[in-house]
């Protein structure tokens, strides 16, 4: 069979399977999730064996140590994946719930009910745990899902797919509820992105290059975020100790993730006193500072920032720093260079905090808290399938509810329209 025929058959099978999973009770879906969790532990030796094939190929191809670490399935990885599934199973089933209800003057009751999206296609890179996260959330929301992982994790993903298939079969559901694309070439991705008749939503998760490729080639709606250019603005009168802690956590905790802080904006009234403090603490962590002329005048070790540093997602121990006149200049900078991901203000001024929240355009705005909290688990959504910086359908971390839509349900007593 050609790539086109294989992908078309998968898409058709997913559409048929979506009707089966869509009408499943919450109890059945939760049983599938807990069975997958149990099977992950039972099949650990098999998963390690298949993962070893990917690790060997990764080392031979010269993949970075950081990428190899993300690719590795360890005991802790399996425990984390299993625990995540158990937590999703414990969540309330969103499908069939009424979002709101109201009465019309003619006696009609009008409501909005949560329903599955249908078929989700997830295209992602590197981390095998995304296979389990995506499958678990889609199942909980009553969706069928087609998964296309990165070529570097092909053996690991196939093994995880077999575990999922066992759990589906055990509970009387078609294995086509969760399908993994068996080939790794880009042609398969292009074919997937052309299946608008059968696939309802595409979610790419990976580097900016992958996401732009998906957006450019998809005839299906795409939920995405290109990059996370997150800012911390230190306001006039801000608590310096708090601001240093927030900057350190945002930059150093995990510099390679999308909710890490990339640019620090400091009110000019605080710059002379605050910048040496933050430089001393973050400097010990190996952070390189790239500053505006005013910053460089205060921090002699800072490198002059170039224009390309302001919109940069460094994903490294590098921090761009700019001294601004006031909050308006900070918000103007964010509007020009931000990526609609996460923005933080450190302030003790209630009025300015509220204005910052209202006017700054981002999927999450933090007041006196780290950018690192823009995460489904941290915000109480449970697991997440990614963070969307698209405003249509979902904005911010995408949990189970974001993998559903709503339909109108109208109840009457024989009313007809005049």
Swiss-Prot record:
EC number annotated for this UniProt entry: 1.2.1.41
Keywords: Amino-acid biosynthesis, Cytoplasm, NADP, Oxidoreductase, Proline biosynthesis
Gene Ontology CC, one term: cytoplasm
InterPro entries, per the entry: Ald_DH/histidinol_DH, Ald_DH_C, Ald_DH_N, Aldehyde_DH_dom, G-glutamylP_reductase_CS, Glu-5-SA_DH, GPR_dom
One Pfam family it belongs to: Aldedh
Annotated GO biological process: L-proline biosynthetic process
Annotated localization: Cytoplasm
GO MF annotation: an example: glutamate-5-semialdehyde dehydrogenase activity
Family designation: Belongs to the gamma-glutamyl phosphate reductase family.
Known role: Catalyzes the NADPH-dependent reduction of L-glutamate 5-phosphate into L-glutamate 5-semialdehyde and phosphate. The product spontaneously undergoes cyclization to form 1-pyrroline-5-carboxylate.
Protein name: Gamma-glutamyl phosphate reductase
Gene coding for it: proA
């Amino acid at each position: 069979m050609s790539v086109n025929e294989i992908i078309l058959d998968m898409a058709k099978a997913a559409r048929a399977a979506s009707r089966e999973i869509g009408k499943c009770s919450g109890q059945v879906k939760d049983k599938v999730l807990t069975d997958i969790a149990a099977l992950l532990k039972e099949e650990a030796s098999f998963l390690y064996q298949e993962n070893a094939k990917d690790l060997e190929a990764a080392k031979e191809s010269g993949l970075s140590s950081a990428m190899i670490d993300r690719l590795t399935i360890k005991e802790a990885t399996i425990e984390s994946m299993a625990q995540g599934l158990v937590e999703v199973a414990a969540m309330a089933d969103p499908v069939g719930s009424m979002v709101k209800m109201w009465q019309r003057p003619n006696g009609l009751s009008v409501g909005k009910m949560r329903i599955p999206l249908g078929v989700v296609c997830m295209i992602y890179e590197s981390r095998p745990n995304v296979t389990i996260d995506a499958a678990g959330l889609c199942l909980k929301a009553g969706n069928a899902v087609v998964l296309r992982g990165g070529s570097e994790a092909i053996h690991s993903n196939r093994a995880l797919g077999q575990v999922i298939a066992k759990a589906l079969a055990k509970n009387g559901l078609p294995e086509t509820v969760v399908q993994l694309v068996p080939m790794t070439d880009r042609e398969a991705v292009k074919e997937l992105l052309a299946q608008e008749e059968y696939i309802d939503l595409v979610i790419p998760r990976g580097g900016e290059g992958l996401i732009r490729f998906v957006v450019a080639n998809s005839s299906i709606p795409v939920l995405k975020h290109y990059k996370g250019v997150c800012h911390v603005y230190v306001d006039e009168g801000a608590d310096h100790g708090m601001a240093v802690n927030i900057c350190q956590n945002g930059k150093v905790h995990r510099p390679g993730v999308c909710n890490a802080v990339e640019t620090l904006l400091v009110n000019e009234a605080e710059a002379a006193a605050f910048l040496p403090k933050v430089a001393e603490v973050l400097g010990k962590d190996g952070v390189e500072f790239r500053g505006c002329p005013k910053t460089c005048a205060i921090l002699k070790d800072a490198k002059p920032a170039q224009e390309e540093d302001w919109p940069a997602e460094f994903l490294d121990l590098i921090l761009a720093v700019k001294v601004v006149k006031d909050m308006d200049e900070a918000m103007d900078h964010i509007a020009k260079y931000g990526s609609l991901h996460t923005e933080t203000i450190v302030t003790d001024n209630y009025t300015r905090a509220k204005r910052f929240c209202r006017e700054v355009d981002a999927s999450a705005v933090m007041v006196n808290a780290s950018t690192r909290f823009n995460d489904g688990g941290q915000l109480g959504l449970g697991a997440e399938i990614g963070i969307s910086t698209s405003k249509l359908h979902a904005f911010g971390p995408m949990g189970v509810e974001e993998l559903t839509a709503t339909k109108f349900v109208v109840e009457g007593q024989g009313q007809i329209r005049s």
